[in-house]
């Protein structure tokens, strides 16, 4: 989570920055969704092959340990398989979807600013949390 202060000269400049962020997030989300489809397909194939081999070998599927170790606050997966990657991409997609929703809600909440008209002599200081506006300070200069 990154909190930043950004300064804008007009409501339209702030709206454009928000639109750009929404577009970037949509594009990124689209890329992740394509990867998710590819990995999901690979994970399903991997699962089917594993089930067939286990059945032919006459063995029961054993619950595997994830081969996961924790180093400080970092989780490290050793010998990652398609299921590990699928889980990681699902987490990223969920996060990007939540971010996109927050950006779109912020855009809706800021529509009233279009009616301000000429705001010469006014700066917009915006507190953003991961690129999502949370607070706007009007500063007269």
Summary of predicted features, one role per range:
Residues 61, 65-89:
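Short, glycine/alanine-rich amphipathic alpha-helical segment
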Residues 21-36, 85-92:
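Short, charge-rich amphipathic segments
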Residues 42-53, 84-135, 140:
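Coiled-coil termination/hinge junctions
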Residues 1-30, 77:
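Short, charge-rich amphipathic alpha-helices with coiled-coil/heptad character
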């Amino acid at each position: 989570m990154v909190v930043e202060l950004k300064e804008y000269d007009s409501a339209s400049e702030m709206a454009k920055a928000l639109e750009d962020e929404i577009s970037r997030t949509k594009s990124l989300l689209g890329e992740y969704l394509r990867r998710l489809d590819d990995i999901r397909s690979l994970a399903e194939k991997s699962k089917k092959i594993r089930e067939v081999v286990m059945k032919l070998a006459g063995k029961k599927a054993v619950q595997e340990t994830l081969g996961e170790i924790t180093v400080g606050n970092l989780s490290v997966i050793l010998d990652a398989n398609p299921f590990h990657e699928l889980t990681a991409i699902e987490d990223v997609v969920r996060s990007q979807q939540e971010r996109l929703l927050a950006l779109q809600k912020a855009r809706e909440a800021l529509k009233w600013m279009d009616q301000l008209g000429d705001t010469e002599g006014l700066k917009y200081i915006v507190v953003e949390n991961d690129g999502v506006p949370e607070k706007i300070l009007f500063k007269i200069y």
